[in-house]
């Protein structure tokens, strides 16, 4: 169950709402390998643990876009809207990959609803997201995510 569940007619009142934190999720080598297969990005810093030990990060790292894609499952732990006929991932305004995520690390999402606006047939929210790496000061990803909810 998400941290916050609201009725569709309340979404316009949510600007500035801190959604808190998701649970931590471990990044596994299997997950990285599957992402590499799905995207045809088999760079050795991701998929060759032996070679990556001697690389710039001392271990294999997750693809930046793999870490970014975790926004969706982590986001589902934080927020939901009841009474919407459709829920759409509308896009991203700003994304920065600020720190590599080593395989075996655990990440979580912190999110705040930054803006809310009406759109034809519904409501759009802009969410300020930070994907944190457990035990590290610098986050993995900072992104502004746009979602739309239609009546």
Regions of interest found by a model, annotated:
Residues 2-62:
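Catalytic strand-loop segment that frames the active site of acyl-thioester-processing enzymes
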Residues 15, 21-23, 31, 41, ...:
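A generic structural signal for short beta-strands and their flanking turns/coil linkers
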Residues 53-59, 69-110:
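Hydrophobic beta-strand-centered segment that forms part of the acyl-chain substrate-binding groove
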Residues 65-67:
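A solvent-exposed, acidic/Ser-Thr-rich amphipathic alpha-helical stretch
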């Amino acid at each position: 169950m998400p941290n916050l569940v609201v009725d569709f007619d309340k979404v316009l009142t949510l600007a500035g709402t801190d959604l808190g934190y998701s649970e931590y999720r471990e990044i596994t080598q299997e997950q990285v390998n599957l992402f590499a297969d799905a995207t045809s990005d088999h760079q050795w810093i991701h998929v060759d643990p032996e070679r990556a030990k001697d690389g710039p990060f001392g271990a294999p790292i997750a693809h930046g876009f793999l870490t970014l894609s975790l926004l969706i499952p982590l986001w589902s732990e934080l927020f939901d809207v009841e009474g919407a006929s459709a829920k759409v991932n509308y896009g991203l305004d700003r994304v920065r990959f600020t720190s590599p995520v080593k395989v075996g690390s655990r990440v979580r999402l912190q999110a705040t609803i930054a803006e809310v606006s009406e759109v034809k047939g519904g409501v759009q929210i802009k969410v300020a997201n930070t994907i944190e790496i457990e035990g590290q000061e610098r986050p993995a990803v900072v992104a502004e995510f746009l979602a739309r909810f239609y009546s």
